Curated annotation (Swiss-Prot):
This is D-alanine--D-alanine ligase A. ATP binds at residues 164-217. The gene is ddlA. Pathway: Cell wall biogenesis; peptidoglycan biosynthesis. It is an enzyme of class 6 (ligase). PROSITE patterns: ATP_GRASP, DALA_DALA_LIGASE_1, DALA_DALA_LIGASE_2. Cell wall formation. GO terms for cellular component: cytosol.
Amino acid sequence: MGQDKLKVAVLFGGSSEERDVSIASGAQVIQALRSAGHQVLAVDTASGLLGAEEERRLLASKVKEVPPDSDSLAIIRSGKQSLLSAGELAGVDVFFLALHGGTGEDGTLQALLDAGGFAYTGSGHLASAMAMDKDVAKRLFLAAGVETASWLMAPASEEEVREQLGFPLVVKPNSQGSTVGLSIVHSQAELQPAIELAGRYGDEVMLERFVAGREVTVGVLDDQALPVGEILLGGQEVFDYEHKYQAGAVREVFPADLPPAIAAEAQRLALKVHRALKLSGYSRTDFRLDEQGRLWCLEVNTLPGMTATSLLPQAAAAAGIGFAELCERICRLGIERCKGARKARS
């Protein structure tokens, strides 16, 4: 890699329902960047800069089978400290956002960093906000010519659901990741309980036509599509929270065993999504491939999982990019983007 070494503050943890996943990402990113010779600070956005013992304890924790409950998150949020006032963060070259969900992914933290003139990884605040809002994102998919399943926002009448979506359908919070609060609904009787569950995790709830088929995913790095991957669900209807983060729950294949034309189309569509939402640095877009060979865009992730075995790093590995190199490239892309943004404003 041969460039100047960086001072990187890795932001992780936080107080969203994806806290455990973020800690796992942060642990791996910190280790990778340190192995490459960079100076790394570990910052839990719920509590601030971590000392050595705090860092060891927190980063050794594992992702549980279910997301943290609301009471646990309320305790974490009540102790929240100021993130950007710590003197130890002076001289940081870039903030690596190993955050998932909540204010770490929805543009809030990005706007704060922009206002402070700090360089950070991933997309800017407007792009992050658009991608996190599934309703807005799906409208942009369609505007870009990328097919996505029909949807309605709750509340919706029985007639609207029956005529526009049918059963089974997917019920999920409009602004959550990792399938938190998501249900597959097979009848009208199951619908209201599923809406109530999703409503615990956000103010808006989406109802979406269920697309049966193969689950494929495409990472984008520096405006280039990475090799396509497939998640072999093993009979599961959906790649849910438990199966995403428990070892051996599913099998992930990179590159996917797909006809070359379909793989190329998935890459083309992922790039269209990345550009339509004005994303930067890196992203990961998930699709369903139906029996007719049509690709349906499910969602785009602006801060995808960053453990060494997460989907984006697996895609990078299939392209010959090791995990430490991937983390460094993401850092340098963030620095370049923020320099460009500052120059444009001056």
